[in-house]
């Protein structure tokens, strides 16, 4: 459950470490984003000599949330951190590696590149 001003970890090797949500995409009054939703973020903390710079405004997809996500079979899944993967303007991941597990809901939302790069899909 990510909303405006939420801080997220970055789960790829794009060079950004922390990002802040500045908009939840998908509706004019949409308040929350969950796993698989696209948000607009501002880079708050980045490594030197990286692909993205501090202050850059980018799109990102949420891959992990602390708030549990219900599934069709009645089970729930939640993670220890709120994390996102940065996306280019074409919708492709900026980084070439994904760190940590990602949720299976990304496969249903057609983020196949992220699912294939992830070390574990839960």
UniProtKB/Swiss-Prot annotation:
A Pfam match: Ribosomal_L14
Give one GO term, molecular function aspect: large ribosomal subunit rRNA binding
CDD domains reported for this sequence: Ribosomal_uL14
* Cellular component, GO annotation: cytosolic large ribosomal subunit
What's one GO BP annotation on this UniProt entry? Answer: translation
| PROSITE patterns in the record | RIBOSOMAL_L14
Q: Does the keyword Nuclease apply?
A: no
The UniProt keywords, alphabetically, are: Ribonucleoprotein, Ribosomal protein, RNA-binding, rRNA-binding
Q: How does it assemble?
A: Part of the 50S ribosomal subunit. Forms a cluster with proteins L3 and L19. In the 70S ribosome, L14 and L19 interact and together make contacts with the 16S rRNA in bridges B5 and B8.
Q: What HAMAP family does UniProt report for this protein, alphabetically?
A: Ribosomal_uL14
The free-text function statement in the UniProt record for this protein reads: Binds to 23S rRNA. Forms part of two intersubunit bridges in the 70S ribosome.
Question: Member of which family?
Answer: Belongs to the universal ribosomal protein uL14 family.
Q: What is this protein called?
A: Large ribosomal subunit protein uL14
Q: What is the lineage of its organism?
A: Bacteria, Pseudomonadati, Thermodesulfobacteriota, Desulfovibrionia, Desulfovibrionales
């Amino acid at each position: 459950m990510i909303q405006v001003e939420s801080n997220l970890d970055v789960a790829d090797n794009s060079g950004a470490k922390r990002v802040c949500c500045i908009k939840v995409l998908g509706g004019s009054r949409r308040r929350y984003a969950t796993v698989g939703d696209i948000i607009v973020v501002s880079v708050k903390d980045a490594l030197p000599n990286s692909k993205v710079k501090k202050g850059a405004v980018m799109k990102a997809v949420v891959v992990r949330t602390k708030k549990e996500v219900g599934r069709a079979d009645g089970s729930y899944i939640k993670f220890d951190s709120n994390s996102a993967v940065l996306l280019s303007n074409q919708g492709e991941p900026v980084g070439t590696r994904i760190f940590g597990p990602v949720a299976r809901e990304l496969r249903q939302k057609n983020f196949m590149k992220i699912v294939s790069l992830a070390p574990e899909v839960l």
